[in-house]
Amino acid sequence: MIKVQKQKINILEENKKLLKKKVGAVVNFIGIARPKNNSGKIQYIEIEHYPGMTEKKIKEIEIYVTKKWKLNNCIIIHRFGKIKPGENIVYVGTAAQHRNNAFKACEFIIDYLKVKAPFWKIEQQKNKKIFIKSKKKDEKKIKINY
């Protein structure tokens, strides 16, 4: 299941959905907006996306990881809009018979979302805006695996 939404993510509700099927392991990742970075305090982060294309790309990755790591269930939720420090940005939950598969799939999804998914992120600081670019180390992980 994938969602791209403005509202905050209800982590407990999403976790319950992962447990509906008989599984041996559940792995979650919750991305949180940071209060500051190396260049200063962050007032908020603004995330934009390409409606339709974003969902399509995330659905493709959900299908890929479900098959590759034999997942019983997979949930990917990413927010857009203005997000304040401390609020959740992204939720990834993977469920599988074995923990190794659930961990690998979850990590791959996060790396994919950071590098390949059509989201644009801008940090608003007191007197400046900073466009957030993907990191080369994350890009290398995706090239190796996908």
Predicted features and spans:
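Short hydrophobic/aromatic beta-strand micro-patches
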Residues: 93-95
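N-terminal, polar/charged subdomain of small-to-medium soluble alpha/beta proteins
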Residues: 1-88, 97-107, 111-146
